[in-house]
UniProtKB/Swiss-Prot annotation:
Record-given protein name: M-phase inducer phosphatase 1
Catalytic machinery residues: 421
EC number in record: 3.1.3.48
Modification Phosphothreonine, positions: 497
Length: 514
């Protein structure tokens, strides 16, 4: 058997599927050489080991050549099997750092055999190294592999268009070299998986799911309406108009929500120069810019108010619409005097100046009777009092004086009663409340004999200091005078006894009603 010329640089492993010459008998070659050379069979087998062919399969041809004179390449070392891994070299370790790790057994075998990447010519496959060193972490062929569930892979349509249409995904498992349907006819061609010169990209880690998910995404995108798509893709807008007066009113009808040109349902700002015609502004939400225009002219307001004031019915309606605290007891009219704030909020107070003006006859045309009730004790009243005042310090005395024979107003004039004591703090206000209470009981609501009651603020002491000319005698005697201690004690006891008897009388009257 003659051996062909051996290459000077490296040895290679070929898988040739073309018709091969008939193999010579192995036994003849071994023993024939022994007879010729005079060597034993074991020695002859050792010498002629590299001259054997057809050992094991008809489609295999192994050529072993020695190239000790040249430096061996990184992928030149191989085992006799042909399907094992190469020994690691300096070039292989450098290439393994540059190429990304890929998954093993990610596609079915039939699809891998039919892939156009496996149908390259023999000349192209010789330009690239086939086998590489696989680390212990990469050697996962014998382990159970489970795909990770893709969350949402990015679509590959963008970068696939820029690639060569004949470029396909790399497959890094050398054990996947399987024949296609052409292997059944007997015409075999060398199958090698070349290394792509292009560096690893995102597609190297593709497991085949991206193509299926891309199709589903395209289908879902076609079914999604444009309005919904605009909600996902439109940017978030957050604006506030500089002028709040330009914003539309609360009850203005919004624009149709079906408009695809507007991402946010908002009415466009109006210009103040050209207001739109045919629009009607709600009166409940006036614009602050045109607030002055909506207010009627002052000349137009009295026309309606005067018509109401001209009739008694209109006057009563206007009075009833006002605050009840500003009306007298029967709600027929307002108070005649200007009142001031005092200790008791439920009572109306007048100042000493108003009292002096009444005494001077300033309101004589409006007042029929002006009654002043001095609620101090008799020794205080004798020491100095207001001209025309009546001293009534007992409640029963006030009731007999005012309610037994009530004063009836005539000609539309008023009957006014003013109460006071030394400071108008306790005795005067208490007497005023008592008269109003008894007057309510004796009349049908809201009618009253004395609807207009007042309390002099500051009492006699303040009035004496400001209006001494209206005091008679022009002097002031306090309640706690040292010369009238016994009188003070006597009147207090009498007032308390009467107050106790009053409470008993009220209790008896309630029991009778039961």
């Amino acid at each position: 058997m003659e051996l062909g010329p051996e290459p000077p640089h490296r040895r290679r492993l070929f898988f040739a599927c073309s018709p091969t010459p008939a193999p010579q008998p192995t036994g003849k070659m071994l023993f024939g050489a022994s007879a010729a050379g005079g060597l034993s069979p074991v020695t002859n087998l050792t010498v002629t080991m590299d001259q054997l062919e057809g050992l094991g399969s008809d489609c295999e041809k192994m050529e072993v050549r020695n190239n000790s004179s040249l430096q061996r390449m990184g992928s030149s070392e191989s085992t006799d099997s042909g399907f094992c891994l190469d020994s690691p070299g300096p070039l292989d370790s450098k290439e393994n750092l540059e190429i990304s790790l890929t998954r093993i057994n990610s596609l079915p075998q039939k699809l891998l055999g039919c892939s156009p990447a496996l149908k390259r010519s023999h000349s192209d496959s010789l330009d690239h190294d086939t086998f590489h060193l696989i680390d212990q972490d990469e050697n996962k062929e014998n382990e159970a592999f489970e795909f990770k569930k893709p969350i949402r892979p990015a679509s590959r349509h963008i970068y696939e268009e820029s690639k060569d249409p004949f470029t396909h995904r790399q497959n890094s498992a050398p054990a996947r070299m399987l024949s296609s349907n052409e292997s059944e006819s007997g015409n075999f061609s060398p199958l090698f998986i070349p290394q792509s010169p292009v560096k690893a990209t995102l597609s190297d880690e593709d497991d085949g799911f991206i193509d299926l998910l891309d199709g589903e995404n395209m289908k879902n995108d076609e079914e999604t309406p444009s309005c919904m798509a605009s909600l996902w893709t439109a940017p978030l807008v957050m604006r506030r108009p500089a002028n709040l007066a330009d914003r539309c009113g609360l009850f203005d009808s919004p624009s149709p929500c079906g408009s695809s040109t507007r991402a946010v349902l908002k009415r466009a700002d109006r210009s103040h120069e050209e207001p739109p015609r045919g629009t009607k502004r709600r009166k409940s939400v006036p614009s602050p810019v045109k607030a002055k225009a909506d207010v009627p002219e002052p000349a137009q307001l009295p026309s309606q108010s005067l018509s109401l004031m001209s009739s008694p019915k209109g006057t009563i309606e206007n009075i009833l619409d006002s605050d009840p605290r500003d009306l007298i007891g029967d709600f027929s009219k307002g108070y005649l005097f200007n009142t001031v704030s005092g200790k008791h909020q439920d009572l109306k107070y007048i100042s000493p100046e108003i009292m002096a003006s009444v005494l001077n006859g300033k309101f004589a045309g409006l007042i029929k009777e002006f009654v002043i009730i001095d609620c101090r004790y008799p020794y205080e009243y004798e020491g100095g009092h207001i001209k025309g005042a009546v001293n009534l310090h007992m409640e029963e005395e006030v009731e007999d004086f005012l309610l037994k024979n009530p004063i009836v107003p005539t000609d539309g004039k008023r009957v006014i009663v003013v109460f006071h004591c030394e400071f108008s703090s306790e005795r005067g206000p208490r007497m005023c409340r008592y008269v109003r209470e008894r007057d309510r009981l004796g009349n049908e609501y809201p009618k009253l004999h004395y609807p207009e009651l007042y309390v002099l603020k500051g009492g006699y002491k303040e009035f004496f200091l400001k209006c001494q000319s209206h005091c008679e005698p022009p002097s002031y005697r306090p309640m706690h005078h040292e010369d009238f201690k016994e009188d003070l004690k006597k009147f207090r006891t009498k007032s308390r006894t009467w107050a106790g008897e009053k409470s008993k009388r009220e209790m008896y009257s309630r029991l009778k009603k039961l």
